[in-house]
């Protein structure tokens, strides 16, 4: 693991993070990185434009028209990023844009163009919708956008200055993207905080949850609520929500309590499971173990991987420390972040059905379950929150 990947934890006491990292406070507040500073993981290029990572930024040269879009789709959120371009450059940010079609038509474009001949839609405006206050980005320097979109409400800041507040409700959810429009432009520090998450654990008792044990369990799991946490020991078994969810953003803090250097508690978060049925649905793995001292070699799919299907690309978390897991699932697509670092970006390619282990894609609603894997299970969960996503 590079120092950049360790930085979010190393900067626990810092007020500001280095480029393309998060502070510990940002991690705890639910921010995630869309750009890891090293690769285009989690992004897809559309059109003939060419994108590359150079000097800690995503850059495009004058190589053709197109856009680079996020794998996951978001509804309500705060987006922060920095960009650098010549003063006469023409680009934009696409928000809530559909997978297919023109992104500024299916969603919205926040303009990056000081010299637009149409005075209504210069930098910071929602193109074809809302005019921003007069504002210019600084050519050749890093500029900061902060965009908040929540329901139909929009707010845009450029370099800390409020330049747009509006009500616009054409599109409710979609990809986040960056435009290539024939000019060189760079982007970095791209991070998102999902909004609208509500607790699914009251911090006091297991109201709203249901225990599901297996008859073969020699040591049934012991679930308890204490000090704002769900604690579990022993197993196998599971604790599932009574409510059901299909497309959603899920966040929680997890601690795997290892009992020694060779003990790495095995658990998981099951998604879209069948109520009262043991270990069904997609499993977002919890296992902070890796091979040969290399965090890019996860054991048993690794924390943040999709069990049976997609290993995590890096084991970011450590045992005996709380880490924050963020899951964004919409339709067939699953994005997972650990401590705000993107580790899984996966699309289920299988035909639709109900039995995931039979290589069927389950798209309907189901319960969220916490797994007690075996008699050595020992974990804590806290700050469990969910936001349902619009269709």
What label would you give each PLM region?
Residues 2-9:
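Sec-dependent signal peptide recognition
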